[in-house]
Curated annotation (Swiss-Prot):
HAMAP family xrefs: Ribosomal_bL34
Any single biological process term in GO: translation
Keyword Ribonucleoprotein: yes
First and last residue of the signal peptide: none
Taxonomic lineage from the root: Bacteria, Pseudomonadati, Spirochaetota, Spirochaetia, Spirochaetales
InterPro entries in the record: Ribosomal_bL34, Ribosomal_bL34_CS
Record key words, sorted: Ribonucleoprotein, Ribosomal protein
Gene: rpmH
Organism: Borrelia hermsii (strain HS1 / DAH)
Protein name: Large ribosomal subunit protein bL34
Length: 51
């Protein structure tokens, strides 16, 4: 049986990445909430970046 999670970096970034979040009003609200909470990673696309 095929497992449900078949990881793909491209699909993940397109669906949950920073630019995808910025496209919609709801996505921008998510980013605002995560900034207010003080998250070091706002979106999944931040995981690859070295600070």
């Amino acid at each position: 049986m095929k497992r449900t999670y078949q990881p793909s970096r491209v699909k993940r970034n397109r669906k949950f990445g920073f630019r995808a979040r910025m496209k919609t009003k709801g996505g921008r609200l998510i980013l605002a909430r995560r900034r207010a909470k003080g998250r070091s990673k706002l979106t999944v696309s931040d995981e690859r970046k070295k600070y």
